[in-house]
């Protein structure tokens, strides 16, 4: 039976799926049919359905948080359907800090390891002890340790070897008792009093000032990854674009700000149908309605082409795009 997907993903394109299933307990996974095509979903804050989906959308809605105190840290075991920001907030209220840089990131806990969420100098991988998942083929529950998750920048094994083969059920986080603030980004450096609560509140204030609320103005958050380029490439760019924001990423690479690249290409406020490059934050695309998946694809390609022609950098979308039966990747053909 057809089910609307418009309220199930925050970009809110008009679309529907053939069947919709909500998983409230893990026993359901053992009897659930995973006949392709199927799409696993949390809160849909990093997913856009471009067209009607011909398969089954399976939403993880399991709940539960367990806290175990150990000698030097707290082990936090969280069900996949829990809201991420609510977890951060509730842990801080219990005087268990560590995740405050990741406050207000939308979505569920189960979706967080898939793309190794990160913000303001901190990535989730720093705190993951292990991830439990349901093996779709074998119908068994298994566990991966941190190294086995193969975390990278907005990346993990769940995007590759275990893509469409695993359903994350529980995430185990280890939060050290000795709090070590990460203040490397912008406004956090200006804090008068450095406390977990102060960092938490500043991160929320900063995100609210830059990012529109997806439930009042549909969007999928940061749409493009910040490109990682070689030190040599950065040096060449800085000779022409001296104010290009960049951050060291390992010994041989730097990360550059995708939002700055888009803004400097003159694309703030650029619009195709009801889809617009947000006027306050160029890294965000917003949907004013009356838009189709084809409009979003055209916008992505226009941004990629504009940035590539100016900086010789091809932007990669961070948001997961779903067409009628599978995930897809959009890349503009660079002009020779």
Swiss-Prot record:
Pathway: Cell wall biogenesis; peptidoglycan biosynthesis. One of its GO terms (biological process) is peptidoglycan biosynthetic process. Gene3D superfamilies: 3.30.465.10, UDP-N-acetylenolpyruvoylglucosamine reductase, C-terminal domain, Uridine Diphospho-n-acetylenolpyruvylglucosamine Reductase, domain 2. It is found in: Cytoplasm. GO terms for cellular component: cytosol. Its EC number is 1.3.1.98. It catalyses: UDP-N-acetyl-alpha-D-muramate + NADP(+) = UDP-N-acetyl-3-O-(1-carboxyvinyl)-alpha-D-glucosamine + NADPH + H(+). Belongs to the MurB family. Cell wall formation. This is UDP-N-acetylenolpyruvoylglucosamine reductase. It comes from Pseudoalteromonas translucida (strain TAC 125).
